[in-house]
Curated annotation (Swiss-Prot):
Gene3D superfamilies found in the cross-reference section: Ribosomal protein S11
Keywords for this protein: Ribonucleoprotein, Ribosomal protein, RNA-binding, rRNA-binding
Family listed: Belongs to the universal ribosomal protein uS11 family.
Gene Ontology biological process terms in this record: translation
PANTHER family per the UniProt record, alphabetical: 40S RIBOSOMAL PROTEIN S14/30S RIBOSOMAL PROTEIN S11
Oligomeric form and interacting partners: Part of the 30S ribosomal subunit. Interacts with proteins S7 and S18. Binds to IF-3.
Function of the molecule: Located on the platform of the 30S subunit, it bridges several disparate RNA helices of the 16S rRNA. Forms part of the Shine-Dalgarno cleft in the 70S ribosome.
Protein name: Small ribosomal subunit protein uS11
Domain of life of the native organism: Bacteria
A GO molecular-function annotation: structural constituent of ribosome
Keyword Ribonucleoprotein in annotation: yes
GO CC list: ribonucleoprotein complex; ribosome
Length: 129
């Protein structure tokens, strides 16, 4: 029996010059998503997606690599300048921003959008190791 041919969607090159780089830096991982001004994702990468496992995901080097790969694929769409929003307290915050600059993107603004509770939910109990 002959198999049906599945038509695959080709990745279309978008000509977007300014975008927003969302860096989510937790204690366990760093996720970098680069979007256009409206929030539509152009490219994304994370330390876990690059093959870092366990505690190696939370290193600044892993955040740097994730930021570099996300910026390279976004620059293929014509991205030149980027605003950076950083969320979370993780160790990969600064190194991810530096990697965006060294990849050739012009960083126009850096915003910290870490959510801070106004005494909301009770935090989890302290770890005793």
């Amino acid at each position: 029996m002959a198999r049906k041919q599945v038509s695959r969607k080709r990745r279309v090159k978008k000509n977007i010059e300014n975008g927003v780089a969302h860096i989510r830096s937790t204690f366990n991982n760093t996720i970098v998503t680069i979007t256009d001004e409206f929030g539509n994702a152009l490219s994304w990468s994370s330390a876990g997606a690059l093959g870092f496992k366990g505690s190696k995901k939370s290193t600044p080097f892993a955040a740097q690599m994730a930021s570099e790969t996300a910026s390279k694929t976004a620059m293929e769409h014509g991205l030149k300048s980027v605003e950076v929003t950083v969320k979370g307290p993780g160790p990969g915050r600064e190194s991810a921003i530096r990697a965006l600059q060294s990849a050739g993107l012009e960083v126009t603004a850096i915003r910290d959008v870490t959510p801070v509770p106004h005494n909301g939910c009770r935090p989890p109990k302290r770890r005793r190791v």
